[in-house]
A protein has these predicted regions:
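Short amphipathic alpha-helical heptad-repeat segments
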Residues: 2-17, 37, 50
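Intrinsic structural disorder/low-complexity segments
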Residues: 8-9, 18-21, 45, 75
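Charged, low-complexity interaction regions
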Residues: 19-32, 54
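Acidic, low-complexity, intrinsically disordered interaction modules
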Residues: 32-101
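Short acidic DE-rich linear segments
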Residues: 102-112
Length: 112
């Protein structure tokens, strides 16, 4: 799958996750499934395209109920929702369960 297609998929799943969370609650099976699916696609993006993406601490984590990382893009990408510099947030705990410590260090240590 192409880089841009993965980003579009992450955006679509993120929107669906937010709707499910608002309609059914954050503990709903569909909400949890969508959140996990989004995180899995974000992990795929970072693994398949490490030259075009990286992790950064989310600057707006204080507005959420858990610590978040931002999946950032080296260059902005034109998407169906406009120009994007990121591929949404990933909860820190999800990133820590999907990546090894070595991978986390690799995806954080980018000279951008």
């Amino acid at each position: 799958m192409k880089f841009e297609q993965i980003i579009e998929r992450i955006i679509a799943i993120n929107h669906a996750w937010k709707l499910a969370r608002d309609d059914f609650g954050k503990g709903s099976p569909i909400t949890i499934s969508l959140r996990e699916q989004k995180s899995s696609w974000q992990a795929n993006l970072l693994r398949l395209y490490p030259e075009a993406s990286f992790l950064a601490l989310a600057t707006d984590s204080n507005m959420h109920d858990e610590d978040l990382y931002s999946v950032r893009l080296i260059k902005p990408v034109k998407t169906s929702v406009g120009l994007k510099n990121d591929a949404e947030h990933i909860p820190k705990r999800m990133a820590e369960s999907l990546f090894t410590n070595q991978e986390l260090n690799k995806y954080f240590n980018k000279d951008v």
